[in-house]
Each structure stands twice: as structure tokens, then as C-alpha cells.
């Protein structure tokens, strides 16, 4: 047993845990009627091939029964203003954080951040292919599904009580690393993922 000094962010996390609540479920005083979810609705149609219904907003936990946005709702509105809803994308020149080939920052709602992150990784990793007898076999450096699920996990499950924090996408010659804010009480980071390139590269 040991005592660990908590900062304000860690204290907030403990309070939320003690009350069995999460940051994203907390209601705000922002009227949902003043915001739109067009990007979310269009993405829902594309992914599910079903029609969007505004009733989903409450069932998804994005608005309250009295028409207020939750913190999660703020992250999905078209004009997201949550400061820490950001990603930093960097393509490094080699195996370490030395010089950069490209670096870009995006601040937007979670649907667009997911798109921007996937696009950046596609643009700065190899997508080779080999010709087979009757078709072409694509050989990308990284599984598209693994990239998608990794980014979703880091965007959704990151600690949004960390003000000024953001998700980092770092691409090296041999790997892609995803890092998001969040740590155990002793400071040990828990939100870290790296993907290795296929040997077919």
C-alpha cells in the first residue's frame, strides 16, 4: 500500500469513478437544438445502409431527455468546439523522432478526426500489390481494419479530462504508433498502441 498524490485531473477521474459516471455521459447546459449532427447522420447511413432517426441521439447518449447535449454529444456535433478533440499526425524520416516528412494537426468532431487519421496513414504508408492470374492482390503495409479499430479505440476511450491532450499518430519506417491521453495513478501510460509493417513490404 502507498499514498499517491493526485492532480486535479486525476481527482476528477476518481470522483467520476466513485459516482459510477463517465465524463462523456455528463450533461451540459448546451441546447441540442442549436447544433446539428449531419456528418454523424450521413456516416451512419453509409456504414449501416439504414435511415437515420434523430431519436438515436438520446439512445446513443449524445443528448439528454430534456434536450441538452452531453459531453459525448459535444464531441459529435458538426461544429465541435471541444478543445481537446484533436489529433496530431506526423510522418518521421526514419525509426525515431528525428526529422519529419510531414506533420499536421486537426481539431474537429470525432467522425472527421477518424477520417483525417485514416487518410493520413494511407497517404504515408505503402500500398503495394501483386498481379495474380485473374485478379490483383493488394498488399498494404498495415491492415485497414487494424488501423480503423486502433484509431476508434484511441479517439473514443482516451481520457478527455486531460485538458490540452490529443491523440498522436506517429508513422515511422517500420511501424505506426498511436498514443492517447490517459494514465494510471502512478503515471504509467496505458493508452499506447503500435502496429508493425507486414513483412511483405
For each predicted feature, which ranges?
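Active-site helix-to-loop segments that bind/position phosphate- or nucleotide-bearing substrates
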Residues: 2-196
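A short, hydrophobic C-terminal helix/tail in secreted or cell-surface proteins
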Residues: 197-201
Amino acid at each position: 500500500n502507498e499514498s499517491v498524490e493526485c492532480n486535479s485531473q486525476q481527482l476528477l477521474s476518481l470522483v467520476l469513478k466513485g459516482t459510477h459516471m463517465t465524463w462523456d455521459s455528463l450533461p451540459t447546459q448546451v441546447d441540442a437544438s442549436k447544433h446539428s449532427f449531419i456528418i454523424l447522420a450521413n456516416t451512419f447511413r453509409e456504414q449501416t445502409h439504414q435511415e437515420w432517426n434523430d431519436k438515436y441521439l438520446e439512445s446513443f447518449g449524445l443528448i439528454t431527455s430534456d434536450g441538452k447535449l452531453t459531453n459525448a454529444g459535444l464531441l459529435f456535433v458538426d461544429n465541435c468546439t471541444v478543445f481537446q478533440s484533436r489529433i496530431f499526425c506526423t510522418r518521421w524520416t526514419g525509426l525515431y523522432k528525428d526529422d519529419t516528412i510531414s506533420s499536421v494537426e486537426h481539431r474537429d468532431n470525432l467522425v472527421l478526426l477518424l477520417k483525417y487519421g485514416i487518410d493520413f496513414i494511407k497517404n504515408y504508408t505503402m500500398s503495394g500489390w501483386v498481379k495474380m492470374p485473374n485478379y490483383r492482390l493488394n498488399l498494404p503495409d498495415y491492415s485497414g481494419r487494424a488501423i480503423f479499430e486502433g484509431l476508434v479505440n484511441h479517439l473514443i476511450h482516451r481520457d478527455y479530462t486531460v485538458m490540452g491532450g490529443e491523440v498522436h499518430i506517429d508513422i515511422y519506417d517500420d511501424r505506426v504508433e498511436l498514443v492517447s491521453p490517459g494514465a494510471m495513478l502512478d503515471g504509467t501510460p496505458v493508452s499506447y498502441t503500435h502496429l508493425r509493417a507486414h513483412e511483405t513490404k
